[in-house]
Structures are given as C-alpha cells and as structure tokens.
Regions:
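Short hydrophobic core segments
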Residues: 11, 196-206, 542-544, 789-799
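Helical element adjacent to the flavin cofactor pocket in flavoenzyme catalytic cores
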Residues: 138-199, 645-649, 687-697, 710-767
Length: 907
C-alpha cells in the first residue's frame, strides 16, 4: 500500500477542485488532487457551457450576479484559450412579463453588468434565426466556456507548480485528527489503495460533498437539483441567447463548439448521481427553443443529458428550494483540517477556490495571498480567446499530421496519440472524449469510436479483448445520451450506428452471448413459391426506392418484360452493406435463387462468409484453412488489422495483423474507402501493395485485406493480388461507404439502364395520382415543378425508419409519407428501443412497418388493401426484425420477387 503526504488534499476534480489545487500550489503548498472518476465528470462536465455575465441572476440573486461579472472578466484574462467570446443577448417574446425589463436593467446596473439595448432588427441581423416576434433585445458580456478544457488547463497549471493529480481515485476513509488528516484512496481501476497524510483537506466534491464530510463524521446537508439539457446538431446561433424573464426552464441557448445547447430544467432529486431525464423535460426544452427560434423543434436534437447542482441545504431548511436557492457559494470549516466549499457556479470556481484556500492558509497560520487572478495560466497555450474555426484553419492551412479521425469535431490521429501519451495507463475512450470532444458531434461516435479504439490499442499495446470492451463501453454511453431523442434524423443516425456496429464490426457478438436462434414463422407471402410472370410485355411499373429491394424488384420486372421506372430520393442502404448478403430464413426462396444466379451471370462473387471488421468469427470458413495475415494501411483510418487479428485469435482462429505503407503519398485526410478502391484499380498500385505484403509474409495460408480491392473489376484485382502474393486473398468489411455495396449498386443500376429501364435517383415522390382504388401514377418534385409519371402498377420499396420510408417525430408519431399508410408500431416512443444499442434481443423499432395482405398489398386504415395495384417490398414491411434474424438482404430479395410476381401476375 503506497503512502503519500501533502499539505493540502483536494477532493474533487471538477472546476472548483482544480482551481483550488492550482491556487494552493501557487501559494507554495504541497498539493494532491483526488478525483473518483476523470476530471469534470460531475457537475462541471454536465452543464450547458455558459460563461455567465451574471445578468441571469441580477434581479433574484444580486450577490451571485456581482461574483459572475467579476469572475467572467478574470477568466477571460487568465485563461482566454478555454473561452469563446460569443457575447450574449437577452431577448423577450410576446408573453414574457413586460414589468420585468425595467427591474432587470436596474439590477444589472447595480451589479456592474453592462446591458446595452439594441433594436429587434439589429438583434436579428446579428442572429437571423431569432423569431421576428421579438419585442426586446439587450447585449450582455456572456460567453461560452469548455468545462473539460477548463479542468485540464487548471490541472496542468497546478502540476506546473508541483501538484499531483490522482484521477479514478475515490476517498473511502477520512480521519480528521489534531495533528492532521489521514485519507484512504482506492484506485477504481486497479483496486489498489493509497494512504494520504495531509495537513488539511479541501472538500470540493460538489454533489458528493455531503458524503465526503460524512466520512469524517460531519453532517453537511446538500440539496440536489437536477437540470436537463439538449444539444442540437448545429449552431443555431453564434451568441448566447437568454430569455428576458425570471429564470425558469429552457431559457438559455448556448453555442458550444459545433452544436447549440438549450437548458435547463430544475428538479429536486434524492441522489447526487440522478442524471435521469423525464420525457416532459425534452418536450419543454424543445417548446422553449421554438419560442425564440421558429422551426427549432423540427431540427435534429443530438444528445440529452442532465447534471446535478449542489445547493447548500441551509437555504432549503428555510423552505427555499429549486431556483429560489441562491447561486452563490459557502465555505464551511467543519474542524481544523477540513474545509468544504459548496454551491456556486462554474463561472465563479476560481473565486470559490480562492476563499477555500484562504481558509486553509488561515488555519495553518500561513501568510500567502491568492495570486490566481493576477496573471495568465502558465503553459504554451494560446494567449487569445478560443475561436471555433481554429481546428479547421489548422487542418486547411497547416501540416496535416495523419488522418482525420473524428470529422464532426475535427480530431486528428496525432491529437489522439498526443492525448494518450499524457496518461500513465491506457485511457478510456470517454477520457479522450472529454479531452478532445471525440464522438460529441452528429454521428455520436458512429465512425470515430472504432478508429479511436484501434489507435489506443496500437499506441498502448492493448490486447484485443480490452480494446473491444472499451469500444463497447463507449458505444453504450453514447447511446444512453441519445436514447431519449430517438426520432427523425437522430433515430436514423443511431440505426446507422447500430448497423455499423452489429453488421460491419460484429461488436455485439464479441461482447455478449450469442443470441438465441428464434424460429419465427414466415409471413404468408414468403411461403408462396409461384414464379414471376414472363409475359408482362409493355406493362408500366414504377418502383419507388433504389435500395436492394427496389433495384431487385426493378430487375425482376424488366426480366418479365415490363417498362420499368425507378424513382428514389437517394441510393438506399446498399452502400452500407458489409459485403455479404444475409439471407437467413429466406435462403430457399426463389427470389434469393434468382439473385444468386444473376450474380454468377454478371461477375459478382458472393462469398461464403467472412469475418466482420473487428474479427467476429464467421458462421462458415472462407478462403481455406490455416493462419491468416490481416493487412491494413498505416495512414488509413478505416481499418485496424491488429484489432481484427487479435479478436480472431482469441476465438481460436490463428491470425496476425500488420500495417503497410500506401504505395503513394496521399495528402488528403478524407481518403474514403471508394477512393482507395479506385487506387486498387491501378495495376501498378496493387503490384506495389503485393510486393510490400509478400515481404511481410511468414507461414500464413491466406491474406485478408479491407474490402477496397477495386471498383471496376474486383475479381481481377483479387486474382492478381493472390497470384503476386502467392496466397489466397479475401476482403473484410470497412466503415461505410461500403465498396462491395457500391459495386453491387453500380452493377444493378448499370444492368437496368442497359435493358432500357429508367433510373431516376435524387428526386422524391411527393404524392400518388389516384383514380378510385388504383394508383395510376406518381408526382415527382423536380427543378421547382411537379412532374407526373403514369403506371399500371407501383411497388413501394422506400425502406423503413432508416431509409426514410417511415418518418417519426418527438411526440411518438410514425407515418408513411407518400401514401399515408398506417404504420404498425408502439405508441410509447421511449419503448421503441431497449437501453443498450447492441442489445442481443434487438429493438421493437426494428419491427415497425406497414401491414400487407398475402399479396404484399399495403393495408389502409380500414384493414383492407389501400389500392388494388400498390405493392410493397423491403424494410417498409412490418412485423420482422431482419437485423437480429440475420436476413437483411434475404428479406429484401424475397419480398421484391414476390411483389413483382403479384404486380404482374404469374404464368
């Protein structure tokens, strides 16, 4: 058991704790800072990012207002690099109390807060998204501050003055005696304990301050108030927006990095870690955003979270609760050797620390004044205010040090490697998120998380099991913050993330027990084995949708002699397909057999199984037996061979991973799978790759590459590589866009065009043209006008919730947008998804879709076919979880075949 000693032990690594450590260290005291998690994982990392001017508190809490405006100026001076000078606007809309404005102005003046009246026109010129219904607008000196950057900046400054930081160390015992304090700290990662002997303890544990005081035998009543916030996926504003009214729910909108954060609520809770969010809070915050920015609630909500405010209970005992509790702070000396600082704001953390350390120095008889407000933090950080575009500017005009790993937040591989080097042991991906904002953008880690896991594994020499477990933990945590917002585009994002992590990576099978095989009954239409008609000459068929189901329906209709017109808003899910076709229980359906025959005829080689990107063991073997070599490229971000090989090896499949350099230097940090596939179409390029790989071969019997081996003629590329290397080669999926999926899309679309079909992608069908109970055509929006195309039969293959065939909103409404067909779904939106993204049972939302009769005709609201000649295929059909059932493509193939058969009749 290690034993440490110091003058001051600071407990709590939030804003107040790190400022206290810095202050005490500057005064010449020996300091240890202990935090039970990572820095700023409590209240300081779960707030809206506002650097307060104090104007919000001017009327109700003038003491806090004065503290905020003074500390606002000090932080700008000593740590400008963690602050974005957004400025602030206080705005009033109709319904806000008019009598509050003069009281607020008077209170701001008394607190020393500059509040400048501007016209509504000027406010909207500065922030065009604001409502034209504004009635008042005032400028104030608000700003945006990054709580994670603040914690790291002050911690590094404290360490420069000799402080020691112990993260993931929880205080489990605290004994305050006449000669000092003895504390027991437990490392939450290793279980090891440390004994710390200190002359004094500063309890800056925020919501946990009462628990820490209780360890020493002292009562401290802290009132916990939970506040919920939502991050929207874009910067609606570049200025902090406050409602000009008494503080209440949802009256602050803060531009933070690439997003906007609206908050907060104020709910009394019973635990310091109660970060739950209730549905009404989401609705209330969106409604309040709509009041100041029209269209706000229709935008994509990205993530919701809550933080717990530690309010000093002395106020609550007098019957004052919630927002009425003052937002200033208290410094409490329980006994010689133990001081607690509680309450306050992140904006006033430096001042809180100053007063706490003043109390310590007074108790120790030390004369050393606070100097933290006198000069900037030490270090080589910029001496200027943070600018949002600084990362992009560095990428565009500086030297690009390696690939861009997180496109949303512009995080490079070099930045991740630098952050990793600062840790004594391998960091969690969530640590890197707090350091770099990794995974905090619109994709919520869908693409960058596995890249970061691969980088951590390689940099720290982690085994594959540990790296994979870290990835799973990060994915689960990202989903937890997005689950309450799963509707619209955000729902589609998490469905995409789920497809990536289940199918392309195989993460669910590596980190959980295999799902039980479910013998689900086939729908009536799937059991019918009648063939498609071969005599539909001249019949006009419109297929809506260009995914697997839509294109295969078009193929079958063309082969039957129909005149086919494919209309689609986009290219469907084919570019997400990992490189194989899951046919599951539909393997003996004639639609699947037709597809496989067609693949053979057109040079498309369906492979019999293969590992997922993370090395999930396949159901069947591929490319023979024996050890395999997994090849990746050193400067390419979308495939990590050591991670794949390590996971294969722990499943009993001998494998070794290597990186080779790309033959030519590629300066672009956005080298996509399709661009790399084009490189492999060049014989000289692949010859050089083969030479590099052959030089690294040992006794491996086969070689696996990322699935980028050519776009034009992958069979030739693979054959030549195999000949040049002297081993069979095979492909392993990469992150989207999928090269195998793109190949299949190109081949299908090209074949249809050569057969005379019309393929119109990029135009949305807006409405049907109906005569009686028949659809005689569809209207398409194109170049500012509507065009009608006529048909004898229509096949609806627009996809499900991901593909856009079904739409959803925050109130739990689901609808089919073209024909207004009823949707089979649960009405409780929170029941659409289970708590874990990769739950092996799947999610109820997977089964949502339209109901059909045995002929695949969609049913209307009365339970009968909506139209005589409308048929459906693919993932718009409800009732089956094809992702968990292992029949994603099989379902598309079988339903497309059946829909065409019913639309055209059969021989």
């Amino acid at each position: 058991m290690a034993e440490l000693s110091c003058d001051v032990l600071v407990i709590g690594g939030g804003a107040t704790g790190v400022c206290a450590a810095y202050d005490a260290a500057r005064r010449g005291l020996r300091v240890i800072l202990a935090e039970m998690n990572d820095l700023s994982t409590g209240t300081s990392g779960r707030f809206h990012g506002l650097l307060h001017s104090g104007a919000r508190y001017a009327v109700r809490d003038p003491e806090s207002a004065r503290e905020c405006i003074l500390e606002n100026a000090i932080l700008r001076r000593i740590a400008p690099h963690i602050i974005e000078d957004t400025g602030g606007l206080f705005v009033a809309v109709p319904g806000d109390p008019a009598d509050y404005v003069p009281r607020w102005l008077e209170a701001c003046a008394a607190a020393g807060i500059a509040a400048e009246a501007i016209t509504v026109r000027e406010a909207r010129r500065q922030e065009p998204a604001l409502s034209p219904a504004l009635v008042h607008a005032f400028r104030v000196p608000d700003g945006a501050v990054d709580g994670f950057d603040m914690a790291h900046a002050f911690t590094r400054a404290a360490e420069d003055y000799g402080a020691t930081t112990l993260i993931y160390h929880e205080v489990t015992a605290l004994n305050v005696g006449s000669t000092g304090v003895m504390a027991t700290l437990q490392d939450r990662r290793s279980g090891e304990e440390k004994i710390v002997s200190a002359r004094w303890v500063i309890n800056a544990a925020g919501p946990w301050a009462g628990k820490v005081a209780a360890l020493a035998g002292y009562a401290l009543r802290v009132a916990w108030s939970r506040g919920a916030m939502i991050a929207m996926n874009t910067r609606w504003v570049n200025t902090v927006i406050n409602r000009l009214r008494p503080p209440t729910d949802g009256d602050i909108l803060v531009p933070v990095g690439t997003v906007s954060v609206i908050g907060t609520t104020s709910i009394p809770v019973e635990r310091p870690d109660d970060n739950t969010i209730e549905p009404w809070e989401i609705t209330a915050l969106l409604d309040e955003g709509e009041a100041i920015i029209p269209g706000f609630r229709q935008a994509r909500a990205l993530r919701a979270w809550a933080g717990v405010r530690p309010l000093y209970e002395a106020e609550a005992r007098e019957g004052i609760t919630g927002r009425a509790v003052r937002r200033t702070f208290d410094v409490i000396r329980h006994a010689p050797g133990l001081t607690t600082v509680v309450g306050g704001k992140l904006t006033t953390a430096r001042l809180m620390a100053e007063k706490a350390v003043d109390d310590v120095c007074a108790g120790l008889g030390i004369e050393a004044r606070c100097t933290t407000a006198d000069e900037p933090l030490p270090g080589d950080h910029p001496r200027r205010l943070h600018m949002l575009g600084s990362r992009l500017d560095a990428l565009e005009h500086g030297r690009m040090p390696g690939p861009l790993i997180c496109e949303c937040e512009m995080v490079t591989q070099a930045q991740i490697e630098e952050a990793i080097a600062a840790y004594a042991r391998p960091p969690a991906l969530d640590d890197l998120r707090r350091d770099l904002r990794l995974g905090m953008g619109p994709c919520q880690g869908g693409f960058c998380a596995v890249r970061a896991a691969g980088i951590v594994q390689r940099a720290c020499n982690l085994d594959a099991a540990a790296a994979t477990a870290a990835l799973r933990a990060f994915v689960d945590e990202r989903f937890k913050g997005g689950r309450s917002l799963l509707w619209g585009h955000h729902l589609r994002q998490f469905l995409l993330d789920e497809m990536i992590y289940r199918r392309t990576l195989g993460l669910d099978r590596l980190t959980g027990a295999p799902p039980a095989v479910r013998d689900a009954p086939l729908p009536a239409w799937a059991a019918d084995r009648r063939p498609v008609s071969s005599s539909a000459q001249g019949r006009r068929v419109i297929v809506i949708g260009a995914g697997m189901a839509g294109l295969m329906a078009a193929l079958h209709a063309v082969r039957a002699g129909a005149q086919v017109h494919v209309i689609a808003a986009g290219i469907g899910r084919l570019i997400l397909a990992p490189g194989w076709c899951d046919v599951g229980p539909f393997h003996d359906h004639p639609g699947v057999r037709v597809f496989l025959d067609w693949c053979t005829d057109h040079g498309v080689r369906p492979l019999a199984g293969g590992p997922a990107m993370l090395g999930t063991r396949p159901a069947v073997s591929w490319a023979g037996d024996g050890e395999m070599l997994i090849v990746g490229f050193a400067s390419w971000r979308d495939f990590y061979p050591m991670l794949c090989a390590g996971n294969l090896a722990r499943q009993g499949i001998p494998a070794r991973g290597i990186h080779v350099d790309l033959p030519r230097r590629h300066d672009g940090w956005d080298l996509s799978p399709t661009r790399l596939a084009h490189c492999f179409d060049d014989p000289a390029f692949r010859e050089e790759v083969a030479r590099l790989v052959k030089g690294r071969l040992r006794d491996e019997a086969r070689v696996g590459f990322p699935a980028v081996l050519g776009l034009r003629d992958p069979a030739v590329v693979q054959r030549e590589l195999a000949e040049q290397i002297g081993r069979p080669v095979f492909e392993i999926p990469t992150l989207p866009p999928s090269v195998p999926g793109t190949r299949l899309l190109n081949v299908l679309k090209g074949w249809l065009l050569r057969q005379g079909a019309r393929v119109q992608i990029g135009h949305a069908v807006t409405r049907p043209v109906v005569e009686g109970r028949r659809v005689v055509g569809v209207a398409v929006a194109s170049v500012g006008r509507e065009t009608v195309f006529h048909a004898d039969a229509v096949i609806l293959a627009t996809g499900g919730l991901y593909g856009g065939g079904l739409l959803s909103d925050d109130r739990g409404r689901l609808w089919e947008p073209i024909f207004d067909l009823p949707v089979q779904a649960q009405t409780d939106r929170l029941a659409w998804f289970n708590t874990d993204l990769l739950d092996l049972r799947g999610h109820p939302a997977h089964t949502f879709g339209i109901a059909v009769d045995e002929y695949l005709r969609p049913l209307g609201k009365d339970g009968t076919p909506a139209y005589e000649n409308l048929f459906a295929a693919g993932h718009i059909l409800g009732g089956m979880d094809t992702l968990i059932g292992g029949c994603e493509e099989g379902f598309d193939l079988a339903s497309a075949y059946t829909a065409v058969r019913e639309a055209l009749g059969n021989d």
